[in-house]
């Protein structure tokens, strides 16, 4: 989690030292791990490398701040390094999970309310952390050996929903 978020720094006032640390931990570390694996040539053919990301890399989410930037860079690293790994028949993907209450997530202002909103906006409901883990296992199987350089949404349909009847009904009830 971003130190800027944890310390309550607004995006327009962020601390750049903290930004750099978050960038290194949340994105650059993925490149570093893949680089070591590349140099040691330690991935099997049709192996899979995976990172978790979040839809805020592609959409605006207030108070997620520089984590959005970090996740966008993480996804870019997966695509770019994935191109090179493809030469060795290794897949590289990111999975964008539903909002999930974690220690880090609990530090985001208004996250509890957002969880409820995301549940209402997801036709299948929010995916749990365990369901995400199950999905990730499939990305290590031969069933997905031609899937690479993708950001795959595992969010109950949240990423594709403009609005749901559940959300409309809540606003209708208020009026």
Q: What feature does the model see in each segment?
A:
Residues 22, 29-37, 77-78, 135, ...:
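Hydrophobic positions on the long internal alpha-helix
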Residues 148-175:
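Short C-terminal tail/terminal secondary-structure segment
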Residues 110-113, 170-171:
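Short, hinge-like loop/turn segments at secondary-structure boundaries
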Residues 40, 141-145, 163:
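Generic structural signal for alpha-helix termini and adjacent loop/cap motifs
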Residues 92, 96-107, 154, 160:
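Short, flexible catalytic-loop segment of classical short-chain dehydrogenase/reductase
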Residues 3-6, 10, 14-18, 22, ...:
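Catalytic loop of short-chain dehydrogenase/reductase
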């Amino acid at each position: 989690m971003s130190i800027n978020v944890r310390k309550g720094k607004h995006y327009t006032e962020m601390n750049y030292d903290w930004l750099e640390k978050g960038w290194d931990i949340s994105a650059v570390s993925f490149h570093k791990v893949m680089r070591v694996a590349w140099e040691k040539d330690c991935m099997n053919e049709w192996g899979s490398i995976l990172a978790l990301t979040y839809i805020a890399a592609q959409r605006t989410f207030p108070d997620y701040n520089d984590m959005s930037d970090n996740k966008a860079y993480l996804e870019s690293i997966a695509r770019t390094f994935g191109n090179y790994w493809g030469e060795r028949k290794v897949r590289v993907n990111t999975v964008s999970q539903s909002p999930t209450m974690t220690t880090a997530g609990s530090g985001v202002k208004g996250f509890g309310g957002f969880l409820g909103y995301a549940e209402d906006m997801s036709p299948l409901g929010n995916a749990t952390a365990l369901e995400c883990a199950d999905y990730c296992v499939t990305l290590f199987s031969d069933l997905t050996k031609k899937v690479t350089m993708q950001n795959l949404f595992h969010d109950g349909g949240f990423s594709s929903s403009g609005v749901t009847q559940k959300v409309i009904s809540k606003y209708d009830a208020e009026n």
